[in-house]
Amino acid sequence: MSRIRFGCQFYTWQMSGKRYIGKLPHISKVASSAGFSGIEPETCMLGPYYDDPAALKDVLTQYNLQVGAIALACNWSGPRETDAEKWEAERVLNYLKFFPDTHLVLSQLPGKDRSNLQQRQANAIACIEAIARRSTDLGIDCSFHPNSPAGSVFRIKEDYLVLLDRLDSRIVGFAPDAGHIAKGGMDVIEIFHTYRSLIRHIHFKDITTSREWAAMGAGIIDFPRIVTMMRDAHYDGWIMVEEESKEAEVNPDTATAKNGEYLRKSLLPLV
């Protein structure tokens, strides 16, 4: 049986720079008011709450939310984690012990270009799997989230074939982002359908035909079709909504409220 839940990914606010770092009560209030049931902050957005999990629990209780996932983004450019990268991974794994049902999302920071592509892909996979092994040992479910900037080593279909053929699905899942898939020139429905058995976490954001970020429902991605597909595949997990449009960068709260309207009208009736 499918149990799909919808939450807010913090990148909508992260685009504003340092303005919203640590503003968990504010973002949670906006997310809850918009009709979302969870949040997904990246570690860099937690601010003082990263040292005080009890305080985060209080915020979640106040706004009737769950922390559906926490995202960790690092370079992972070498054949193994650097000491600093391993420290960051251990920190988030220790933090997640306080939130036993929360998913860990791993996302690689893009480089300046795609030089030495095969080696960089192999290095990234090695680092991701090293973290995933430790995560699995702790009972923490995790997935890898590819992105689409020009310097990403997992951004086009050929990259996805490499990634999803090599990743050990016993310890790490696939966290597809509909917007990044489209921006990488791929068929979003095809990717979700082909790899649906590997999917443990999902990101939604919309994009136009000219590959400009857009509000939910204002672009080309057929979100209702994806939700229906994942429901029928008995997906039990989160779909985190974010927006990277210029409008969202200026006013993430308003963008989230509008995306909540789309959620209530077009997606919630499907699950």
What are these regions (language model features)?
Residues G7-Y11, E40-E42, G68-A73, V105-Q108, ...:
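A cross-family glycoside hydrolase active-site/sugar-binding cleft signature
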Residues P25, S37, P41-I131, T136, ...:
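Structural motif corresponding to the early beta-alpha repeats
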Residues L138-I156, Y160:
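Hydrophobic, aromatic-enriched interface-forming segments
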Residues M1-G35, T61, E90-N94, P100-D101, ...:
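Histidine-acidic metal/acid-base catalytic patches
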